[in-house]
Amino acid sequence: MTASTSVAVGCAVGIPVGVGIIIAVCFWFNLQKRYKREEQDDRELERAIYDESGFVSFDNFGPLRDSKDEAALASSELKNPDHTSGSSEGSAHPEEKDGKSRDQEKPLGKKNSKYYVPAYRRKINLLQVRNNNYGNNARQKSVVDLPSINNSSNVSLSSSQRHITKRQISVYDQMVPVISDEGPKFFADPSSDTNTSNDQNKASMIELKHNTRQSSNENLIRKLQNQDFGSYYPRRASSSFLNGNISNASFHTRNSSITSVNKRDALEDVFATPKSAAQSQLPNTFDKDNEGIDADHSVKDSRSAITDKDKDIYKLQNNYDVGNIGEIAEEDQYENEFTNYSQSKREFIESLRPK
């Protein structure tokens, strides 16, 4: 009982597996044969491609013909009768030629259907077949239509020229157009084309280019002077009368004693903070019309005004001032009312004290 069961299971499993393995081996052998054929075809194609006479063009279909086609054409030429033969013999040749051409096309079609052929190889084969058919038809027409030997060469030449139209490359296909850069010369009147006019045109063009370049540079300078390059607070448009030492708000935002020594009567500093600007304007608050008043009264009034103002004005102290060289700088030299952290800290501490 157990033996019969094991035999049944072995047959049920082993027979299908064995048949499948045999079929797979057969397919594998067929595939290997196909790969070998394709490799051989590819080698032939590479040989034809790298051959100088094998390039595909409309003028050299002759080198692309196969040896079998050439042998068939040679045999057909040997079988052709003389041109002096009757019209009955010549009329029978087109049908025979058509039959032969069909017979030649059939094996090619069978070969394409039986074996795998790439698309570019199919195109080359079709071009070869068309060229062969066209040559056979041209020969048949020349044999049938020509009545005599004298007219045969002329008519065959004219028919071949009629059917085969080659495109001739002209000089204009290889010409590179070049246009001169000077506009007035290109559209100038030929009658007025003299040396003097050319010199005048050159001088006028040079002068025009120089003027345009100079005007563009001036406009650029004006735009750069009026632009605000990242200052902390909006400022007025800059003017050309400002001092050269004050270049930008990001570099000078303090009222230093070094710059204020030689600038008593200078214009308003647009880069200074409001508090420092008020301090710099203190010496200019005196009216010049009242210089005739007593010197003692004016000195006393100015001293009292300065002492009153100094209580409310916050002064930036740093090592860059002449007056406080020995002191240690406690504030940043680029501080203003927006970035004065020390003053804000002091105000905050004072606000915390009980009142």
Swiss-Prot record:
Residues 70-114 are annotated as: Disordered. It is found in: Cell membrane; Bud membrane. Keywords: Cell membrane, Cell wall biogenesis/degradation, Membrane, Phosphoprotein, Signal-anchor, Transmembrane, Transmembrane helix. It is a single-pass type III membrane protein. One of its GO terms (cellular component) is cellular bud membrane. Residues 1-8 are extracellular. One of its GO terms (biological process) is cell wall organization. The chain crosses the membrane at residues 9-29. It comes from the Eukaryota. The modification Phosphothreonine is found at residue 273. The modification Phosphoserine is found at residue 142. Residues 30-355 are cytoplasmic. Residues 92-108 have a biased composition (Basic and acidic residues). Belongs to the SKG1 family. Plays a role in cell wall integrity. Affects the cell wall polymer composition in the growing region of the cell. This is Suppressor of lethality of KEX2 GAS1 double null mutant protein 1. It comes from Saccharomyces cerevisiae (strain JAY291). The lineage of its organism: Eukaryota, Fungi, Dikarya, Ascomycota, Saccharomycotina.
